[in-house]
């Protein structure tokens, strides 16, 4: 990559980070302006268009990055699990670390999931579906259950995890610890339920064939 291309990539990165830094519990992406983001990134507003067509394209890039960040962290969690960690507890801890270190990235996913922009809703739905698919792959490999079971289990788990994540954004350390414990319990219940439901279906199938 040439010097000019490197500089362009650094500026693009600065714009993305500037936009993330301006999000907060009180401020959504929809309230950001091109001028504010450009000023925070240290460039002229007219230079913004060398990197993104408009603010919406910047936002969609941020959604993609947020989803990718989360999936990469959860892959790392699965590597830690392979070395002997508790599957559910390690996954919950990793997810909470993501929220703690990237609260605005998670806020973006939460808000735009049900926002007014169809393009943003579709982008977040796509990222969540990627997350569900990767988890279903892992469950299928580890639990040796059919895809239909692992997809249903993964979807239920992701729904509960995202709901808990929304609560974690606004609580203190002790409340967060309690939420983590509750989430671990809920995920274990889903996991046990999926296993016993599958076993029951297998028993019914065996009886029908007898």
UniProtKB/Swiss-Prot annotation:
Residues 10-70 form the HTH tetR-type domain. Its main location: cytoplasm. Residues 33-52 bind DNA. Keywords: Cytoplasm, DNA-binding, Fatty acid biosynthesis, Fatty acid metabolism, Lipid biosynthesis, Lipid metabolism, Repressor, Transcription, Transcription regulation. GO terms for biological process: fatty acid biosynthetic process; negative regulation of fatty acid biosynthetic process. PROSITE patterns: HTH_TETR_2. It is found in: Cytoplasm. One of its GO terms (cellular component) is cytoplasm. It comes from the Bacteria. SUPFAM superfamilies: Homeodomain-like. GO terms for molecular function: DNA binding; DNA-binding transcription factor activity. Pfam families: TetR_C_46, TetR_N. Represses the transcription of fabB, involved in unsaturated fatty acid (UFA) biosynthesis. By controlling UFA production, FabR directly influences the physical properties of the membrane bilayer. PANTHER family: HTH-TYPE TRANSCRIPTIONAL REPRESSOR FABR (PTHR47752:SF1). Homodimer. HAMAP family: HTH_type_FabR. This is HTH-type transcriptional repressor FabR.
């Amino acid at each position: 990559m040439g010097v000019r291309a490197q500089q362009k990539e650094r500026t693009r990165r600065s714009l993305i980070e500037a936009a993330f830094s301006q999000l907060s519990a009180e401020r959504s992406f929809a309230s950001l302006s091109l001028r504010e983001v450009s000023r925070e990134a240290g460039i002229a507003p007219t230079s913004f268009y060398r990197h993104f067509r408009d603010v919406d394209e910047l936002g969609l890039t941020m959604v993609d990055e947020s989803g990718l960040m989360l999936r990469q962290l959860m892959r790392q969690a699965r590597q830690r699990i392979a070395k002997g960690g508790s599957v559910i507890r390690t996954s919950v801890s990793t997810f909470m670390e993501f929220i703690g270190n990237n609260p605005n990235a998670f806020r973006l996913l939460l808000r735009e999931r049900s926002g007014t922009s169809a393009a943003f809703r579709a982008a977040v739905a796509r990222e969540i579906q990627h997350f569900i698919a990767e988890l279903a792959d892992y469950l299928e490999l580890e639990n040796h259950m059919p895809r239909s079971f692992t997809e249903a289990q993964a979807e239920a788990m992701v729904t509960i995890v995202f709901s808990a994540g929304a609560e974690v954004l606004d609580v203190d350390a002790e409340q967060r610890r309690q939420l983590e414990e509750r989430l671990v319990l809920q995920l274990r219940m889903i996991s046990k339920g999926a296993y016993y439901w599958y076993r029951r279906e297998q028993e019914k199938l065996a009886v029908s064939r007898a």
